[in-house]
């Protein structure tokens, strides 16, 4: 990218629709995203999945760094996550897909600002609001079968703290711009999805 184009986002909001999907670990983001992909033809990009894939990619210069961050419940440097997201959006746009759910991102203020400045402005944040005790129960249950290294009680508590300290300020910032839809997630998947569908219909 040349110096002359650094202030221009890579995509126009008329060309690409991005909805950020945030919520604490175990809030049910993945389940709801799967339903939206099926019913509304969204492309679901999970920042965590992109990072895990990069971590396992042979010859990745970032693999070890990503592995350590995930293990410690820390946030991966934003340059890596932004590059992976940008490449994934670009590949899908080339395939004529223009609607994206970005799950688990932005997790910090600087990520939010950099994404909207360099890639594309988001439509809104879909925030899955769930009590910690329910999220903990779901994650420990998932950990029995998921094989994920971070589905253990120590990693989960670190992830809860990271979410509260770094992601809640992002949600509060977007609330000042009237760009947050809060959905209560201490209910059945079907009840949550009804509210999610209402939000999608109102926005697109």
Swiss-Prot record:
Q: Where is this region: LID?
A: 141-151
Residues the record lists as binding ATP? 26-31, 142, 187
Domain of life of the native organism: Eukaryota
User: PROSITE patterns attached here?
Assistant: ADENYLATE_KINASE
Q: What is its EC number?
A: 2.7.4.14
Q: Per the UniProt entry, what are the Gene Ontology biological process annotations, in alphabetical order?
A: 'de novo' pyrimidine nucleobase biosynthetic process; CDP biosynthetic process; nucleobase-containing compound metabolic process; UDP biosynthetic process
Q: Which keywords does this chain's UniProt record carry?
A: ATP-binding, Cytoplasm, Kinase, Nucleotide-binding, Nucleus, Pyrimidine biosynthesis, Transferase
Its biological purpose: Catalyzes the phosphorylation of pyrimidine nucleoside monophosphates at the expense of ATP. Plays an important role in de novo pyrimidine nucleotide biosynthesis. Has preference for UMP and dUMP as phosphate acceptors, but can also use CMP, dCMP, AMP, GMP, dGMP and dTMP. ATP and dATP are the best phosphate donors, but can also use GTP, dGTP, dCTP, and dTTP to some degree.
What the entry says about domains is: Consists of three domains, a large central CORE domain and two small peripheral domains, NMPbind and LID, which undergo movements during catalysis. The LID domain closes over the site of phosphoryl transfer upon ATP binding. Assembling and dissambling the active center during each catalytic cycle provides an effective means to prevent ATP hydrolysis.
Q: What is this protein called?
A: Uridylate kinase
């Amino acid at each position: 990218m040349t110096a002359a184009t650094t202030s221009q986002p890579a995509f126009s909001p008329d060309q690409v629709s991005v909805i950020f999907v945030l919520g604490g670990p175990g809030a049910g983001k993945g389940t709801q995203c799967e339903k939206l992909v099926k019913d509304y033809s969204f492309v679901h990009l999970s920042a965590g999945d992109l990072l895990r894939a990069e971590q396992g990619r042979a010859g990745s210069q970032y693999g070890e760094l990503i592995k350590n961050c995930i293990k410690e419940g820390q946030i991966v440097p934003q340059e890596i996550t932004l590059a992976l997201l940008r490449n994934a959006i670009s590949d899908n746009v080339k395939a004529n897909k223009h609607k994206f759910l970005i799950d688990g991102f932005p997790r910090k203020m600087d990520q939010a600002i950099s994404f909207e400045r360099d890639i594309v402005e988001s439509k809104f944040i879909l925030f899955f609001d769930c009590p910690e005790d329910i999220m903990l129960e779901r994650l420990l249950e998932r950990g029995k079968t998921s094989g994920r290294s971070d589905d253990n009680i120590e990693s989960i508590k670190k992830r809860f703290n990271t979410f509260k300290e770094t992601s809640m300020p992002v949600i509060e910032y977007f609330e000042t711009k009237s760009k947050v839809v809060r959905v209560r997630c201490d209910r059945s998947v079907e009840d949550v999805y009804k509210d999610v569908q209402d939000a999608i219909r109102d926005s697109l």
